[in-house]
Amino acid sequence: MIYQSPTIQVELLEDNIARLCFNASGSVNKLDRETINSLDAALDAIQQDSHIQALVLTSAKGAFIVGADITEFLGLFAQEDSVLLPWIAEANVVFNKLEDLPFPTISAINGFALGGGFETVLATDFRIADTTAKIGLPETKLGLIPGFGGTVRLPRLIGTDNALEWITSGKDQRPEAALKVGAIDAVVAPENLQASAIKMLKDALAEKLDWQSRRARKQAALTLPKLEAMMSFATAKGMVFKIAGKHYPAPMAAISVIEQAARCGRADALKVEHQAFVKLAKTDVAQALIGIFLNDQLVKGKAKKAGKLAKNIDTAAVLGAGIMGGGIAYQSASKGTPIIMKDIAQPALELGLGEASKLLAAQIKRGRSTPQKMAKVLNNITATLDYTPVKDVDVVVEAVVEHPKVKSMVLAEVEQNVSDDAIITSNTSTISINLLAKSLKKPERFCGMHFFNPVHKMPLVEVIRGENSSEETIASVVAYASKMGKTPIVVNDCPGFFVNRVLFPYFAGFSGLLADGADFAAIDKVMEKQFGWPMGPAYLLDVVGIDTGHHAQAVMAEGFPDRMGKNGKDAIDIMFEAERFGQKNSKGFYAYSVDRRGKPKKDVDPTSYELLGAEFGELKAFESEDIIARTMIPMIIETVRCLEEGIIATPAEADMGLVFGLGFPPFRGGVFRYIDTMGVANFVALADKYAHLGGLYQVTDAMRELAANNGSYYQS
């Protein structure tokens, strides 16, 4: 053994070829400070051993290196530039040392080599991957850019345009795509990975492969004609800004770094990268996006833990076909759980099967599936008009019409037709789980399972715990949602559960603005362009359905009359009474039509202004700050109430629910990250300015106390 540490072992193989193996004590290899320090020491030991003539980098884990340890680096990001800049420069000395070894080097990549893991392999002369590999630089998804030489080495390896696309998109790359552009040199079967890597090193030693010129190219300036460079970077900036927008600075920063460093050698190019990395690491956007990443890990960790308590879910059933039932059936079947789709009407079953077929056909069109896979998924969906095929399923998802009496009747009926240990769930957005449980003989085997529409696109599932739901029931439904490829969060029963409970105060703030004369289109523009929502409140109501919103609003008003009760008509009532239900009947706040490409198109509709004007009078202009405050303060305070009341367990789960369930702007990180970034005391002061508008704008005593103690919701 040439070198050994808790994370890295180096040994001599045949023909004086050394193997450096990443082998951390945990389940995966991460590029943390300990690993970087070990790599530095290992390279020193390698340099001091005169027998070594070549080096192969391998991993003893199922993945090469999954990336940097972001939890550890968050502490570093909080340091002053005078600390962070020298640290990243020193870390890069290690990768330079790897790149400068006096003999050929290769990385044998299995599984993930992402972020710092991919930057590590970029420092070797050759890269060979097995068929399981995924490589890439996802840092821009975290509000950062690569900091270990990725913006320097990758453009010099695969060309500027390819590197710009890889880095700004942050997407993982399959080995075939990486081979095509030259990011790796070969793709082999997993069992042949190390042997193939050693053969390449032997070819390099025999001068069949020119490792020295490859290395020199990575360390030199980019060989790109000036005019071509100008066009390349200008095109990239235009395309990337169109996608990323002003709220996500990292992709644009990556382009600027590569452009500035294009005429530089390695040393100066790395300095450009380091300066930009440190600047981005300090931004609120990076903190928010890293926070989402960590919150996602927490939620997935909880789901994994729940899996240990869960019963096996091998077969499922959905009651109620149509669009929602078809979407649920598609999601379950496509992720490997066969599902029975039951309805009382043959046309509904045909609609449900048609929805699943349509979604599968779209996957084939995008190149993400094949006719063979489509057939397999459709074979996993069994349509039926009676309960006979349902009797042996492990879990049932009731997805009939959103009406308490109908749901209660169906739930009682299905309980008589399934095994005693089957779990029954209700896909409801507003109806109390405790109320529905009264129709069942075994309420402990029952909970809510709220999917969001469209099911195949929306990642969130709310798992709603009733007062009698057993832990096994909750754990099993969480595990089933995870198996379906969804992100489950567990919430306790209350009107609206979590997501709808916090959404409708936002709509109430919107309605209040309209009652005071605001222009709904102007509100949408501010909330989309400035705050960052994918849709403003008027557009969102049209998409959800004004009739659906009207019903849910009544449920919320009944559940929380002090805060959500109304005096007189609001904008939702006006649209509902005028039978303007939104996209579903082509008229809501906006008018809807289909453009030449067959896509929905929205236009401002004078009729909406006439209806609202008759009730609320002439339009008035509002400052953007007022619009944001009056819509967001109610949502934020209601989210805080949900945490304080135990409806949602943690700020992390609340923020993930908002981002995945409502499209809360990721660059803001969720409600609790938003409050912490603003400062709790600053938010309380802002809310107090609007407290006269009613209970939705009045902060809780606990929040006021947190502000007084200079506290925060996330503990740093």
Curated annotation (Swiss-Prot):
What biological-process terms (Gene Ontology) are attached?
A: fatty acid beta-oxidation
Q: Which GO terms describe its cellular component?
A: fatty acid beta-oxidation multienzyme complex
Q: What are this entry's molecular-function GO terms?
A: 3-hydroxybutyryl-CoA epimerase activity; delta(3)-delta(2)-enoyl-CoA isomerase activity; enoyl-CoA hydratase activity; long-chain-3-hydroxyacyl-CoA dehydrogenase activity; NAD+ binding
TM spans (from-to): none
- Give, as in the UniProt entry, the pathway in which the protein acts: Lipid metabolism; fatty acid beta-oxidation
Known EC number(s)? 4.2.1.17, 5.1.2.3, 5.3.3.8, 1.1.1.35
Oligomer and partners:
Heterotetramer of two alpha chains (FadB) and two beta chains (FadA).
Q: What is this protein called?
A: Fatty acid oxidation complex subunit alpha
Species the sequence originates in: Shewanella sediminis (strain HAW-EB3)
Q: Taxonomic lineage of this organism?
A: Bacteria, Pseudomonadati, Pseudomonadota, Gammaproteobacteria, Alteromonadales
